[in-house]
Amino acid sequence: MNRQIRAVSLLAGLMFLALMVNLTGSAMFRQASLNNDPHNVRVRDAEFSQNRGNILVGSRPIATTTSSNGKFAYQRVYLSGPKYAPITGYYSYYYGRSMLEQTQNAQLTGTSDAQWLSRITGTLSGHKPEGGSITTTINAKAQDAAWDGLKGKKGAVVALDYTTGAVLAMASSPSYDPNELASHHLNDTTRAWKNLVADPSSPLSNRATREIYPPGSTFKLVTAAAALQNGYHPNSMVDSPENWILPGTRTPLTNETNCGGSRITLAHALDISCNTAFGKVGVSLGQDKIRDQAERFGFGKVVNSDVSSVASRFPQNLTDAQLAQSSIGQFDVA
């Protein structure tokens, strides 16, 4: 009997120890992820009871917080909501967070590691914690132009500062109003969410970062760079037939314009965007060299972690016909 009691006691002790280890591990190592989990009701209630930081374009807030007499002390408000929705995302009590509202949540709630001093100061002074603001790289005029240009159309516009990679504009159409998801009223928010999800035009999808499209002739820059890295020169002569039957197929590759002869320089082929010339150059280089150059340009990588993004791609195991099409930004390049 004593042996059985000792065995049960040992088992109970081990189970208690395992529980303590799990709780300690959760507290020490999973604190950040638990605090940032939008499904954590305790943290979520605390967030909605404090003054969240602004998201700024220049000095102008595009997402801010106002006092509220509703369920919580503060209400999230979006200015020009649909125009900036692909950047700010939404901040919803019932449906979580997206885009900058998600990736910069720690800064916006004042819980980031860099804000430890302000938290201590606030505690000592008895003030409630407040979130910190974030300033985007968006240029207001560029964003206006992008948004206005997309009116009535389906698509996306992104403008970059090529010297730094800074995003100057990011617009997606059709869009949505994040104010509808920021409401504290469950019925209103649920109705808005269901309508957005059911909309066949997918307004919740950020076409600038979450959708991938064939790059088309812009990819010829990648093929040209691969050529220059592998023995070609700007004045190298390349074949540029008016029509070219793709290897192993009956499919012709044609040109949108007259390339200027059956053989032209690589520089001229790029200048006039000659399809057959770059298709042939791509096949002569081989898919490994084209793919390597594409990866140097960022293909296969998520290039912007501040908003939810998907990686671009250059396909594998290509036939020569597929490689020719890929070398001009078609086939499965996206």
Give residue spans per PLM region.
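Beta-lactam-recognizing serine transpeptidase/beta-lactamase-like catalytic domain environment
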Residues: L168-S217, V222-A334
